[in-house]
């Protein structure tokens, strides 16, 4: 697979000797051969290097590349000056020299099959899946001009210039024709996306400049492959046999290959989005669909002789919105890290094997004039093409490309493994000077990656190019940006112009009305309250950072430095179970579980020692983490159970929410929570005494002060209801709905009719039946306080200005005192005629 040579068994013999020594030291008999030797006896251990040679060598090379990457980043001074790609090429040269010194043969090399089918797809898929779509499509015209016109310009000018110098006799006697020079020019025109990503990510240029260079490197590969195939077929036919019809077919082939590859990528993107819509019950295999279907788009385009790079790029671009909305948060994290890991590993292996492949004397043919003139021509014509195309673009671009940006664009035309793989694919029988082309390509790749990669960062700093800012846009910026988009879209619509904003608005409307309904699951299509989602994420981050800070300082740091902020922000009181949510269970679990006698000690003991013990006890009880139950970690092939850290973070989040709600109420009402609880308790006991003296527990209408309590049987969850799913709760938003039903609301004392307090019949009963985990038991006793947490899901369900009550009639004493007595309606006359 890696172009292994024939001397593998010799290296395996050395490894066999080493393993044999270890085995004999351990008392194990090791003899070469099969399971039965010449003596006919059974051998305990046999050495089968040839059986595992290929996968073992591949695993070792991946391990060496990964360890080298770790070693590079141990010294920040080196990586801040030298690009990682250049270091990997140098490492490959060193390893290739060691292998050559041991075997005197190029045992390992980067073959085109391995590069195009196994190493390049993960890199391009990662670039497409994480592509900033708005920035990419906003500069799509500029990117296409540089990718199409610029690539044709570079290929034609480089090939024709080299052919002109060859005719002058400066290159000596070479067996090269015009078509051979044009074929070589098409190879040199390929700006490699791997090299561009590796260098420009470390430079951190501004977003517009980066997306132009990166987009050009992605899209110009289609033009490069088309030109390569056209000129290779012309070379096979011979210059005398090429007709005008063949040239027209070559031009048509460019559009077919480019547009066909793009269409294949879009079709597979929609297929991937549609498949992930129905993976709700098989979450564990969601990441597999993302990688398999994307890779199938690449292979399908390669099978149809279309642009495979464009196919997998647009597959990632078009599917990212729908896939991220359909899959779970855990699957999205898996896809993100796996894709980054594969892309980084493939990039590391590519650059290292570029260095290893160069250590092979049999591929080198030196021609000083050809090599130097190639370097000069690709640099000069790249700069000329950028200047001419930018002059044309600036006449229509709103944001002009400054001369400094043009210098970076000209200097960023890096060549890499794409050019090397294409030149290795050349047929040596048809292209007589293949070794010269290979040698020159290696020199060009090393020059652009190492020299230009080393100097581009100082050049950017010297020219004071605008750098990218790694920060989140503020809320004010987001609001104004969205407002400007709507305003510009309206202006273009009124004036009759079709611009970027008009097209973006029409596409958003089409996507929202048709595509999202087909490619997104229904739960993802619902309008969600983003403010609540952001609040949910902030609380989770707050809980995680709080626990991390506590672990860093030590478990008893709260005792040594108790601060007011820590007391207010986090509450480590027990929370209710998600399975049992009845009022009786909540009241039972509200009792302190540790040393109940400490409550009475505060009233009797007054010594300093006792006071310190009580403070220490209550501090430990409040702040140390107390697990609810012992979780049984069972293995499951089809489900991904949440880890202990996720459960603890979720529990701390609920405690934080409960503490903040209590702090908010006490601040708003200006009451102490202990005094308030005592008043409520006294009022409740008085109400019970009054109810006990009245038959059926109903107060007359003339009573000036009425109160009511919640019936426990009305608030208990039914046994037939499903318990809430923990995984869906982790990935969902915050729900501020208490368990109030219409039946409960109708069973209440009499009072004044008020339609404001009547419950909404259109509201879903299942939503009302869910009790927030952070809602304290006191909330279920006082309906007026519980109503403060009943925030609707979205503006579409915001139906009233007043909170829900358990009764459709007001029971406030002052309203009953001021309101008129209820009287039967007066009988109307049968006829109201005069």
Curated annotation (Swiss-Prot):
Modification comment: Phosphorylated by PKA, which inhibits activity. Phosphorylation at Ser-663 by SGK1 is associated with increased abundance at the cell membrane. Phosphorylation at Ser-718 by CSNK2A1 regulates SLC9A3 activity through the formation of multiple signaling complexes.
Membrane topology: Multi-pass membrane protein
Chemical reaction(s) catalysed: Na(+)(in) + H(+)(out) = Na(+)(out) + H(+)(in)
Residues given in the record as a 1,2-diacyl-sn-glycero-3-phospho-(1D-myo-inositol) binding sites: 138, 141-142, 398, 497-498, 500
UniProt region (Interaction with EZR), positions on chain: 575-589
Biased composition (Acidic residues): 717-728
Disease: Diarrhea 8, secretory sodium, congenital: A disease characterized by watery secretory diarrhea with prenatal onset, prominent abdominal distension after birth due to dilated fluid-filled loops of intestine, elevated fecal sodium concentrations and low urinary sodium concentrations.
Known function: Plasma membrane Na(+)/H(+) antiporter. Exchanges intracellular H(+) ions for extracellular Na(+) in 1:1 stoichiometry, playing a key role in salt and fluid absorption and pH homeostasis. Major apical Na(+)/H(+) exchanger in kidney and intestine playing an important role in renal and intestine Na(+) absorption and blood pressure regulation.
The protein's name in its UniProt record: Sodium/hydrogen exchanger 3
């Amino acid at each position: 697979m890696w172009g292994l040579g024939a001397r593998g068994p010799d290296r395996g013999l050395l490894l066999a000797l080493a393993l044999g020594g270890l085995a004999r030291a351990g008392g194990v008999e090791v003899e070469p051969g099969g399971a039965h030797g010449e003596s006919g006896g059974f051998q305990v251990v046999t050495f089968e290097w040839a059986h595992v040679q290929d996968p073992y060598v591949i695993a070792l090379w991946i391990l060496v590349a990964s360890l080298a990457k770790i070693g590079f980043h141990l010294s920040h001074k080196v990586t801040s000056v030298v690009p990682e790609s250049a270091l990997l090429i140098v490492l490959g040269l060193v390893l290739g020299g060691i292998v050559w010194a041991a075997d005197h043969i190029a045992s390992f090399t980067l073959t085109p099959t391995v590069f195009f089918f196994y190493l390049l797809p993960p890199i391009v898929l990662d670039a497409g899946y994480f592509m900033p779509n708005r920035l990419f499509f906003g500069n799509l015209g500029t990117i296409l001009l540089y990718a199409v016109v610029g690539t044709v310009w570079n290929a034609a000018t480089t090939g024709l210039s080299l052919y002109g110098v060859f005719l002058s006799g400066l290159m000596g006697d070479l067996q090269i024709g015009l078509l051979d020079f044009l074929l070589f020019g098409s190879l040199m025109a390929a700006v490699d996306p791997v090299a561009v990503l590796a260098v420009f990510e470390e430079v951190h240029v501004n977003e517009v400049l980066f997306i132009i260079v990166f987009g050009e490197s992605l899209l110009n590969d289609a033009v490069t492959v088309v030109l390569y195939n056209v000129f290779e077929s012309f070379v096979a036919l011979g210059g005398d046999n090429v007709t005008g019809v063949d040239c027209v077919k070559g031009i048509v082939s460019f559009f077919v290959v480019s547009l066909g590859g793009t269409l294949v990528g879009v079709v597979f993107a929609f297929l991937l989005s549609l498949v992930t819509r129905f993976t709700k019950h098989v979450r564990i295999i969601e990441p597999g669909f993302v990688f398999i279907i994307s890779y199938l788009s690449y292979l399908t385009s390669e099978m149809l002789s279309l642009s495979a790079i464009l196919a997998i790029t647009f597959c990632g671009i078009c599917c990212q919105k729908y896939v991220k909305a359909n899959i779970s948060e855990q699957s999205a994290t898996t896809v993100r890290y796996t894709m980054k890991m594969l892309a980084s590993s493939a990039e590391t292996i590519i650059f290292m094997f570029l260095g290893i492949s160069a250590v092979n004397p049999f591929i080198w043919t030196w021609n000083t004039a050809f090599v130097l003139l190639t370097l000069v021509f690709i640099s000069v014509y790249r700069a000329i093409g950028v200047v001419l195309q930018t002059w044309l673009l600036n006449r229509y671009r709103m944001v002009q490309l400054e001369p400094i940006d043009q210098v970076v664009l000209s200097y960023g035309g890096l060549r890499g493994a794409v050019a090397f793989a294409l030149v290795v694919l050349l047929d040596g029988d048809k292209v007589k000077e293949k070794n010269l082309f290979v040698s020159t390509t290696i020199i060009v790749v090393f020059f652009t990656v190492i020299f230009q990669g080393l100097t581009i960062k100082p050049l950017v700093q010297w020219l004071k190019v605008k750098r990218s800012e790694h920060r989140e846009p503020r809320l004010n910026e987001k609001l104004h940006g969205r407002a400007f988009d709507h305003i510009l879209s309206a202006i273009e619509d009124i004036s009759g112009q079709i611009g970027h904003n008009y097209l973006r608005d029409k596409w958003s409307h089409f996507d929202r009305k048709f595509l999202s309904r087909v490619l997104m699951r229904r739960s993802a299509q619902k309008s969600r309250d983003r403010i609540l989602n952001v609040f949910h994420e902030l609380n989770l981050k707050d809980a995680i950072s709080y626990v991390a800070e506590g672990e860093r300082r030590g478990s008893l740091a709260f005792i040594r430095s108790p601060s007011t902020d820590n007391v207010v922000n986090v509450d480590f009181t027990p929370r209710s179970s998600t399975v049992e949510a009845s009022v009786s269970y909540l009241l039972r679990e509200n009792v302190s579980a540790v040393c109940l006698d400490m409550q009475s000690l505060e009233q009797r003991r007054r010594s300093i020692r006792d006071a310190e013990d009580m403070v220490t006890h209550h501090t430990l009880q409040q702040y140390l983490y107390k697990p609810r139950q012992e979780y049984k970690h069972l293995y499951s092939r089809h489900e991904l159970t949440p880890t202990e850290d996720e459960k603890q973070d979720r529990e701390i989040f609920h405690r934080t929410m409960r503490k903040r709600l209590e702090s908010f109420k006490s601040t708003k009402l200006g009451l102490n929570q202990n005094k308030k609880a005592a008043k409520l308790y006294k009022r409740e006991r008085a109400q019970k005494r009054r109810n006990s003296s009245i038959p059926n527990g109903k107060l007359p209408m003339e009573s000036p002060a009425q109160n009511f309590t919640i019936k426990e049987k009305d608030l208990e969850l039914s046994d037939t209801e499903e318990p809430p799913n923990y995984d869906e709760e982790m990935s969902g938003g915050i729900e501020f709905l208490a368990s109030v039903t219409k039946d409960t609301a109708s069973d209440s004392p009499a009072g004044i009719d008020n339609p404001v307090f009547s419950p909404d019949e259109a509201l879903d009963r299942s939503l009302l039946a869910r009790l927030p985990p952070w809602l304290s038991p006191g909330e279920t006793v006082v309906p007026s306080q519980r109503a403060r947490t009943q925030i609707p899901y979205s503006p579409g369900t915001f139906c009233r200005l007043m909170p829900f009550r358990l009764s459709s009639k007001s029971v406030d004493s002052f309203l009953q005192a001021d309101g008129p007595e209820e009287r039967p309606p007066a009988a109307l006359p049968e006829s109201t005629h005069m």
